[in-house]
């Protein structure tokens, strides 16, 4: 006669579940660890590429009245996930505007391609990090921040169109883009140290 199998002890299930949960959390945490070394150099290297790509325009430009102001105090956060989402959003907008076929002739196209590749790769890394952190946290990103950033970049696009993508209009956008790279530096530096 066969001996009936003893029922699995509930504590055994708990240990198995805890082991699986810890493994999932370790995998999720490591998904964002690869960003730390990149954060240290991404903004600096991107700014350098940007300077090489888009030198300051030598001609004097009339003062443009671009009403594309941005209150950068809303970017202040110590929440790493929010900083990552904000950085991701900014980079997507920068990529869109800098990949325009109407960039000025004096911009170095190979440097521009290098910068766009760098932005694209970093954005992909952020997406992986955000996808994995979404399994742990459902913290909502402030909608007004997303809309404010979107409105600002929409204003820059309109400004370029209204000024027929002139070199002077691009000079204004160049200055704005430089400021955005500095914002990204502050976002990534303040939340990952």
UniProtKB/Swiss-Prot annotation:
Glycosylated residues? 65, 71, 108, 186
Gene3D superfamilies per the record? 1.20.1250.10
Q: Name one GO molecular function term.
A: cytokine activity
Q: Which family does it belong to?
A: Belongs to the alpha/beta interferon family.
- GO cellular-component terms in the record? extracellular space
Q: List the disulfide bonds.
A: 32-129, 61-155, 68-168
Name the chain's protein.
Interferon type A3
Q: Which GO terms describe its biological process?
A: adaptive immune response; B cell activation involved in immune response; defense response to virus; humoral immune response; natural killer cell activation involved in immune response; response to exogenous dsRNA; T cell activation involved in immune response; type I interferon-mediated signaling pathway
State its location(s): Secreted
Asked if Metal-binding is a keyword of the record, the answer is no
A Pfam cross-reference name: Interferon
What species is this protein from? Gallus gallus
């Amino acid at each position: 006669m066969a001996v009936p199998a003893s029922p699995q002890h509930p504590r055994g299930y708990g240990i198995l579940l805890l082991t699986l949960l810890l493994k999932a959390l370790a995998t999720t945490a490591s998904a964002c660890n690869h960003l730390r070394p990149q954060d240290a150099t991404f903004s600096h290297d991107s700014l350098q590429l940007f300077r090489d790509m888009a030198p300051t325009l030598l001609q004097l430009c009339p003062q443009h009245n671009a009403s594309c102001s941005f209150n950068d105090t809303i970017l202040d956060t110590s929440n790493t996930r929010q900083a990552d989402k904000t950085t991701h959003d900014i980079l997507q907008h920068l990529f869109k505007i800098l990949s325009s076929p109407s960039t000025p002739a004096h911009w170095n196209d190979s440097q521009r391609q290098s910068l766009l590749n760098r932005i694209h790769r970093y954005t992909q890394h952020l997406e992986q990090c955000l996808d994995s952190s979404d399994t742990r946290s459902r913290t909502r990103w402030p909608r007004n921040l997303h809309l404010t950033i979107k409105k600002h970049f929409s204003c820059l696009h309109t400004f370029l169109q209204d000024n027929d993508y002139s070199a002077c209009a691009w000079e204004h956008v160049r200055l704005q883009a430089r400021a955005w790279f500095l914002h990204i530096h502050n976002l990534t530096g303040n939340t990952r140290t």
